[in-house]
Structure formats: structure tokens, C-alpha cells
């Protein structure tokens, strides 16, 4: 008499195909539409392997490491392809139900008497496996998506502080939008790298587009000026509003040696650049 684990392993392609058909009929899919054809075989291979792992566990083999590796890789794949946790957990539960159906059919078709206790034990092991998959999957998915979000945030922050060279040795840095501690630190690092790469002698820093300049922002601006000075770059600030000036005074920051102008146009004009009106 064929054993349950052997029966499931021999029918892993059928089980996987049934799972795929149920998922697609429910409007659920592992990958985005543009990737379906390319990655369908990978999806099949992945879930045929899962059938094999679960089958091994039903004959009381220790599959914890294999199950963890499978769950981690699955989480990374689905996070990269932007499949939601809700969709994924739903697909795991679909897999659970299909595997249970195959176990139930095997029990009914078996010529041997399968006790209620044995059937219950198979069900318990199956549920335990799927529960462990979901637990490991959701934790890893969260970690991967947080890394992705942080990387995107870093990229956005870097792009939000571009120095525009207007001639050899002269660049403009218009700051726009709210500045928090993280963005301020990124701006400082990005500005120093860009100034060095562009070989600037003068940097026009315009802050008229920053809605709120609090203590932290004012201090970071001062750090930018101080740091660029060490690189031999003269920084001219424009767009300082009265409330910004008050913040600087309250902080006790010494801007006496810093050149400031009311507007960027005036700052450029003082350096010999003529602003043509459209």
C-alpha cells in the first residue's frame, strides 16, 4: 500500500496545478500581470517543493529548516513583486484546503483502515506547517518592505536636494518642502558630495521654499554652511524670512560671516548674473 507522503509527492504537479487554478479563479496571483508568463514556472517549482516538504513532515521528518528557507524566499519574492500580505496569506490558506482535500481523498480511497487519530494527526501537522509558513513569511515580508521603503525614502531625499550648476564653479541649491531630521542629515551628506564632484567655489542656498524653519532646520543649515566652508566654498543664503531670522537669533547661531540675500535673483545679480524677465 502506497504511503500518504509518497502519494502526495507523486501528485505534486496535480496539487500545484489545482492550487494555481483556484488562485486565478479567485482573481489572486503571485506576480503582477506583466510578470505572469515569465515567472509561472518558478511559481510551480516553488509550490511543488512545498508539497514535497509537507509530505515529508507527514511521515514525521523534521522539516523546520526547509520550511523556514522556503517561507523566507517566498516572502522576498512576493515583496519584490508587490504581492500583498493579504493576498499571500489567502493563497497559503487555499493551499492548506487543497492539501487537506488530497489527504481526505487518500484516506477514503485507502484499502487500509486509517484511524481517526491518524487522520487527526495528519491534519494537525498540515495546519502546523501552514501556520509556521504564515508566521515566518509575514515577519520576513515586513522586513523586506521596510528595507525597500527606506531605500526609496533615501532616494527621494537625495533627489530633493539637487545642486544645479549654472556655470563653472557656481551652483544653486533650492530647498523645497518640509525638512525633518532624517532629510536634513541626507541633505548635508548629499550637498557635500555634490559640491566636491562639481568642484564648486560658490553655492547659492535658497530656502524660500521651506515652509517651516525650526531649531533643527536652522542648525542643519548652519552645518551645511560650516561644512562647505571647510571645502573652500563660499555659501550665499537667500530667501530668509523674518521668522527664520528670529529662529537663528534664538539659537545663538553666528551668521555674521555668512552672506545673505533677500532673494535668489538678487543674490545672483550681485555675482554678475543678469535675470531676464519672461
Curated annotation (Swiss-Prot):
It comes from the Bacteria. Transmembrane segments: none annotated. Pfam families: RsbRD_N, STAS. Disruption phenotype: Cells lacking this gene have no visible phenotype is response to salt, ethanol or energy stress. However cells with multiple disruption (RsbRA, RsbRB and RsbRD) have an increased basal level of sigma-B, indicating this protein is a negative regulator of sigma-B. The modification Phosphothreonine is found at residue 181. Keywords: Phosphoprotein. InterPro entries: Bact_StressResp_Reg (IPR051932), RsbRD_N_dom (IPR025751), STAS_dom (IPR002645), STAS_dom_sf (IPR036513). The keyword Oxidoreductase does not apply. Residues 160-271 form the STAS domain. Phosphorylated by RsbT. One of 4 functionally non-identical RsbR paralogs, it functions in the environmental signaling branch of the general stress response. Probably present in the stressosome with RsbRA, RsbRB, RsbRC and RsbS. This is RsbT co-antagonist protein RsbRD. The gene is rsbRD.
Amino acid at each position: 500500500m502506497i504511503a500518504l507522503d509518497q502519494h502526495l509527492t507523486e501528485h505534486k504537479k496535480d496539487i500545484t496545478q489545482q492550487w494555481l487554478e483556484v488562485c486565478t479563479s479567485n482573481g489572486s496571483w503571485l506576480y503582477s500581470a506583466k510578470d505572469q508568463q515569465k515567472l509561472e514556472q518558478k511559481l510551480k517549482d516553488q509550490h511543488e517543493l512545498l508539497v514535497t516538504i509537507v509530505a515529508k513532515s507527514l511521515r514525521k521528518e523534521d522539516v523546520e529548516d526547509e520550511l523556514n528557507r522556503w517561507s523566507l524566499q517566498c516572502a522576498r519574492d512576493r515583496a519584490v513583486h508587490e504581492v500583498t500580505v493579504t493576498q499571500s496569506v489567502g493563497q497559503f490558506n487555499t493551499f492548506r484546503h487543497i492539501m487537506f482535500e488530497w489527504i481526505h481523498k487518500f484516506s477514503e480511497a485507502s484499502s487500509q483502515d486509517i484511524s481517526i487519530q491518524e487522520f487527526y494527526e495528519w491534519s494537525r501537522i498540515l495546519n502546523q506547517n501552514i501556520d509556521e509558513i504564515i508566521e515566518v513569511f509575514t515577519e520576513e515580508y515586513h522586513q523586506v518592505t521596510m528595507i525597500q521603503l527606506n531605500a526609496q525614502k533615501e532616494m527621494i531625499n537625495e533627489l530633493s536636494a539637487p545642486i544645479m550648476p549654472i556655470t563653472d564653479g557656481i551652483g544653486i541649491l533650492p530647498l523645497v518642502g518640509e525638512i525633518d531630521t532624517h532629510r536634513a542629515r541626507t541633505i548635508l551628506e548629499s550637498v557635500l558630495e555634490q559640491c566636491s564632484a562639481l568642484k564648486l567655489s560658490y553655492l547659492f542656498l535658497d530656502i524660500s521654499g521651506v515652509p517651516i524653519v525650526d531649531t533643527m532646520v536652522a542648525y542643519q543649515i548652519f552645518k551645511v554652511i560650516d561644512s562647505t566652508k571647510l571645502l573652500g566654498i563660499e555659501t550665499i543664503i537667500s530667501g530668509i524670512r523674518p521668522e527664520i531670522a528670529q529662529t537663528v537669533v534664538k539659537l545663538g547661531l553666528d551668521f555674521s560671516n555668512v552672506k545673505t540675500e533677500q532673494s535668489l535673483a538678487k543674490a545672483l545679480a550681485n555675482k554678475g548674473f543678469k535675470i531676464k524677465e519672461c
